[in-house]
Amino acid sequence: MLQTQTQVERSLLSRTMGWLALSLALTAGGVYLWIAGVVPQNIPWFLYFLIAIGLIFAIQATANAKNHTLAAGLLGLFSVVEGLFIAPIVSYYLGAAPDAVGNALLGTVGIFLVAAAVVYLTSINLAAWGRYLLGALLLGILVSFATLIFHLPVSQLALSAFLGVVFVGLTFFDFWRVKAQRAGDNNALLLALSLYLDFINLFLILLRIFGRRN
């Protein structure tokens, strides 16, 4: 029996959100393991960062090669590593500005709900957004590194706000990709990875903004 277009969209959305929820749960577990001292806290942050970057490429390669079992395992490992990577940041704000953590989490969830509702309840077409959002993201990353290395007089709050707008746009765009089924043969795992990165980055940006207010 042939599925209708709506059934296909819902199936892909449910699978994508399932992978996203699992990934976020594993990340929360990674944060807990670090804060609880189960994992050594003296491991350099850049080691987790390099491992995470390598895993992103590995997930994309294995998913595109249709090795879904390995890709799923790598996504789980990546999610835990990402939790260990962001754990020191979360731990700091839990001590210095605990309200900021809750506000950042609620804000991120709210943005995701709004993005999903707008994309799925309207006929909005975001096909042209991709290149501009990617360009804006690269610009934000370059400015961030330049500010860090050359100590440029750039407002960190303004930079955070700019990157926040970019990731809000990426969240809308990635939900549109799910609806339009554009991710290398409708791969729910890769779509979930994109939305996961949107979620984590938005959470960290909002955490920085709310933390400054406190």
Q: Predicted regions span which residues?
A:
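A hydrophobic alpha-helical transmembrane-helix feature that marks the membrane cores
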Residues: 1-214
